[in-house]
Every structure is written in structure tokens, then in C-alpha cells.
Amino acid sequence: MDYKAIAQQTAEQVLAYNQDLSGWKLIKSSKKVTVSSKTSRIFHGNLYRVEGIIPESAAHLSDFLFKHDHRVSWDKSLKGFNVIHKIDSDTLICHTITQSFAMGSISPRDFIDLVHIKHYERNVDIISTKSVDFPGYAPTSTYIRGFNHPSGYVCSPLKENPAYSKLVIFVQTEMKGKLPASVIEKSMPSNLVSFLLNVKDGVKTYRIPPIRARHSSHSSVHKKKEGHSAIKP
């Protein structure tokens, strides 16, 4: 399987979703977060578009979302997350396990996803996600294996204030199992609002210092941590 080619194609699909402003129906607006949807052209379900403003630069926000440090700590929708294979510095394969939601009516799912970050003009970053097969990670009886059709984040500087970001999230998840579509459609909007708010809180709590600051403080940070047996990258 040519994971790199799939990753590039998925990023372009997410870019196309972001540029297509027609046919979206606003289904929820709460706490300065909006959720819109339209019928997916790929599977029998919906493509969701979530939008909000994050008080962080687009570069820092995309770095935070792609690196996945502390992911389970800030993302309340997950109970497990692991990077299982690194293809290159911009492309990863990850295994995620979700919490149950909709008051327990939707049980935990697991996903094997190809995650890729791509940089575009005007400081726009896209982090794309698409489910793939990966050796050694076949579905098990423990969790229902879900499938993410092309999904992802679009991080761009806010025009009025480039120190802030506009975050647009596209979600196109096939839950699998024997779930009525009505259960998914009823629960998704609130969960998507909660997720964007989790991002907003997480990027503030686990703030990543500017790259130049990281380089200049490298030696002092190393001295402080040299007594530890392991240091997270």
C-alpha cells in the first residue's frame, strides 16, 4: 500500500472540502463554535464541518494537533492513542480508541488512521486523516473497528489577528456496527463542539514554545532533564 500517495490525496480532498462552501446546513452553534453538515458523497452518512477560533498561531496549532503529545489528556473523546508507525516526519499511522458516547448507546470504537500534515501557501496547514489497513493491527473482538473517510483539520491565520487561528475540522466517520443513523446524527453535533473546545483548552494547557525559543533553550532544558530516564520527544 502506497501510504504516502494516499496521504497526499487525502490532504487534497480535505482542501477541496474547505474550499467548497455550497450545500452546508448549519445544525448547531454553541460557545462560538459552529457545526454544519452535508450528505457524504463517499458513504451513507454525513460530512461534518466544525469551525471555531483558537487563540494561538496557525503554526503552533497545527504543530500541537499533529504531534499528538498529551492527546489522551486533552481529547476527552479518546481512551487510547498510539503512533504505531512513522513513515516520515510528516506522515504517521496511528491507533486510536474512542470513549463510548451518546450516554453509552455508542460503544467504544478503534481506528487505524493514516495522519499527514501538509503546508500550503499563506501559512495554511492541513492535517489529514484516513483509515487504512496496517499489518499486525487487524480488527479484534474487543472493539468495533470504525473507519474514517477523508477527514482532517485546516489551520489558517485569522485575517483580523494573525496571532489567532481559524480552525476548520472535517469529520466523515463510519461508525460501523448496527447503529441507527438517527443515533449518530443526534449525538455528533454536541460531540464535535466539545472536541473543538477540547482543542482550545489543550493547546493553551500544553502550549508549545516558539521554534526559535526551543532551539535557544535546548541546552538548558537538557541539563534540567538529564537525570530522567526517559524524555518525551
From Swiss-Prot:
Domain START: 1-208
Tissue: Testis.
Pfam families: START
Protein name: StAR-related lipid transfer protein 6
One GO molecular-function entry: cholesterol binding
Source taxonomy: Eukaryota, Metazoa, Chordata, Craniata, Vertebrata
Domain of life of the organism encoding this protein: Eukaryota
Residue ranges with Basic residues bias: 213-226
Gene Ontology terms describing biological process: lipid transport
Role according to the record: May be involved in the intracellular transport of sterols or other lipids. May bind cholesterol or other sterols.
InterPro entries linked: StAR-like (IPR000799), StARD5/6 (IPR043556), START-like_dom_sf (IPR023393), START_lipid-bd_dom (IPR002913)
PANTHER family in the cross-refs: PROTEIN CBG07384 (PTHR46374), STAR-RELATED LIPID TRANSFER PROTEIN 6 (PTHR46374:SF2)
Region of interest (Disordered), ranges: 213-233
